[in-house]
Curated annotation (Swiss-Prot):
Residues 27-55 are annotated as: Disordered. The lineage of its organism: Eukaryota, Fungi, Dikarya, Ascomycota, Saccharomycotina. Component of the MICOS complex, a large protein complex of the mitochondrial inner membrane that plays crucial roles in the maintenance of crista junctions, inner membrane architecture, and formation of contact sites to the outer membrane. Plays a role in keeping cristae membranes connected to the inner boundary membrane. Also promotes protein import via the mitochondrial intermembrane space assembly (MIA) pathway. This is MICOS complex subunit MIC60. It comes from Candida dubliniensis (strain CD36 / ATCC MYA-646 / CBS 7987 / NCPF 3949 / NRRL Y-17841) (Yeast). It is found in: Mitochondrion inner membrane. Residues 85-564 are mitochondrial intermembrane. Disulfide bonds: none annotated.
């Protein structure tokens, strides 16, 4: 009876170990946090405020440090290469130190643009878009498949183990009455247990299998070892072998997929490497062509500069040689001229002492005669001009100032043209003729009034002046009639009143001045009239002033002609 009890207890322990291992393999244990006791605040006492939290110290970030360091290095490196394109000393430093990728970056800074950068980015992007790497979802899906298959295998194993124990009950499954009625069973205790085979991968697959698959295989092996540790009677080696075969197939499949992926990746990388190498080769050829073009351009420029400098030096040498030769020839000519002059002077001295003794006196007399002839000719010309000017002026005076009644009217313009030709060298005469021309251009010999004509017109104008002087301001028809009547009653004033300002005194002074030939005084008296009387006398004043101006200009021309 003691044997049975021990066996039943041992079987229960083994079953508990299998069930606990299964639960441990499938489900993780839950962690239950202990209950927090409620806080009790003491009454009647004030709790001091909690101290302020300490300032949070900024933790050191390795990623931030690396990012800032990389950014600073990039800025410094790019700034150095950009400065190298502007400064020759920095360029020499970059070339001497052989900074990495300095040639490509300097060429991109000098000749590159945003379009080139976008094109390079698109090319690089298109090269790597065709390479398809396994995503995390694919790996997780494969891992889940393996785990589900392992769980199915575990479930099948449990079913087979349970089916072996359905046929008989252990001592622990019987009631106490059944145990007393049942006879004593003697069982042989087996000390040697055959262990289930563990899942192992082939040697060629062990190195290339993914870590997730290895972890799954390890979980299966742990489960198999837990089964070995239990006291289950019949163990299905075929099931474990099938699991082992399935896992090996999965591992080989995964290995083949990994190899295919590696081969595809290597092909893509080779294609990318070939394209990059071809692009680098093309860029190298372009740079070589650019350098050769620049070299040829610089060579042509240097050759042109050297040829230009050589031509300038040759021209300067030719000019110097020709100048030296011309100087030498000039010196020879000067020397020959001096010798010739010396010979001529000796001959002249010999002749002077002989037949040409009075040659200098004769030359002086000839020069004096030339000067006298020139002066005499000038005097004759000036006298001729004077005579013509006198004749023209006299003719103009006789025609304009004292015309005879029987003469026909003649134009004045021909006489002015003749004066203009003669007086082209004298400024005063030119100005006088210029002022005289507009006065007499449209006039004839009878259009200029004489003193007698001016006096006659003034006498005709006097009655109108008397009547106009009697008109009140803003006079109407009655005022005009009254002024005409009262002007008839006025008595003429005899004699001259120097200080009189009435109209009779002015008329008397004008008539007296015209009788004496003092036209300027008469015009001045008439010009000083006011009001309606001045308007009536305006035409007479204009004619008088025209005669005065003509007389003055003719007198100026005559006076100037006398001093030419």
């Amino acid at each position: 009876m003691i044997r049975i009890t021990s066996r039943s207890v041992k079987g229960a322990v083994n079953i508990r170990s299998v069930s606990t291992s299964t639960v441990r393999f499938n489900n993780a244990p839950k962690v239950v946090s202990p209950p927090v006791p409620p806080t009790v605040k003491p009454q009647g006492s004030e709790i001091p405020p909690p101290p302020p939290p300490p300032p949070k110290t900024k933790k050191f970030s390795l990623f931030g440090f690396l990012f800032k360091t990389t950014l600073l290095a990039t800025v410094v490196y790019g700034g150095t290469l950009y400065a190298a394109t502007k400064n020759d000393k920095v360029m020499d430093f970059v070339i001497d130190k052989q900074l990495p990728f300095h040639e490509e970056l300097i060429d991109f800074i000098e000749n590159g643009s945003t379009e080139d950068l976008e094109e390079a980015w698109e090319n690089l992007k298109s090269k790597f878009t065709n390479v398809k790497l396994p995503t995390k979802d694919d790996i997780d899906e494969l891992t889940q498949k393996l785990e589900h298959r392992g769980e199915d295998i575990i479930k099948e194993t449990k079913k087979k183990i349970a089916s072996t124990h359905i046929g008989h009950k252990s001592g622990t499954d019987l009631t106490p009455a059944e145990q007393l009625q049942r006879g004593v069973e003697i069982e042989s205790v087996k000390k040697d247990f055959a262990h289930l085979p563990l899942i192992e991968l082939n040697s060629d697959l062990g190195k290339s299998v993914d870590d997730t698959v290895k972890q799954t295989i390890t979980s299966f092996n742990n489960f198999i070892q837990s089964i070995d540790a239990s006291s289950l009677a019949n163990k299905d080696d075929k099931l474990v072998a099938s699991v082992n075969t399935s896992v090996n197939q999965l591992a080989s499949r995964l290995n083949s997929l990994t190899k295919d992926f590696d081969n595809e990746l290597q092909k893509k990388l080779k294609v990318s490497q070939t394209e990059l190498f071809s692009s680098f080769t093309r860029k190298e050829l372009e740079l070589t062509e650019n350098l050769l073009h620049q070299f040829s351009t610089e060579k042509q420029q240097l050759e042109s500069k050297l040829n230009q400098k050589l031509n300038q030096e040759i021209q300067a040498a030719r000019a110097a040689i020709s100048q030296a030769a011309s100087n030498a020839v000039a010196m020879v000519r000067i020397e020959q001229t001096k010798n010739f002059e010396k010979l001529v002077s000796e001959k002249l001295n010999e002749e002077r002492t002989g037949r040409l003794a009075n040659l200098e006196k004769l030359n002086d007399r000839i020069i004096e005669l030339e000067k006298f002839a020139e002066g005499f000719e000038t005097q004759i010309v000036s006298n001729h001009k004077k005579a013509i000017i006198h004749q023209t002026v006299s003719k103009l005076k006789s025609l304009l100032l004292a015309p005879t009644a029987g003469d026909k009217p003649q134009p004045i313009k021909p006489y002015l043209d003749e004066l203009t030709k003669i007086a082209s060298d004298d400024e005063v005469l030119k100005l006088a003729i210029k002022d005289l021309s507009p006065l007499v251009t449209n006039e004839s010999t009878h259009s200029i009034l004489t003193n007698a004509q001016l006096l006659s017109r003034w006498e005709q104008l006097a009655p109108e002046l008397r009547s106009a002087s009697l008109l009140p301001p803003n006079a109407g028809l009655l005022g005009h009639l009254a002024s005409i009547v009262f002007s008839k009653l006025l008595l003429p004033v005899k004699g001259i009143k120097e200080d009189g300002k009435d109209i009779e005194s002015v008329i008397g002074r004008v008539e007296s001045s015209l009788a004496r030939g003092e036209l300027d005084i008469a015009v001045e008296e008439a010009a000083n009239l006011k009001g309606w009387s001045r308007k009536l006398a305006n035409d007479w004043v204009v004619e008088g002033r025209k005669r005065l101006e003509i007389e003055f200009l003719l007198g100026l021309i005559e006076s100037e002609s006398r001093i030419i």
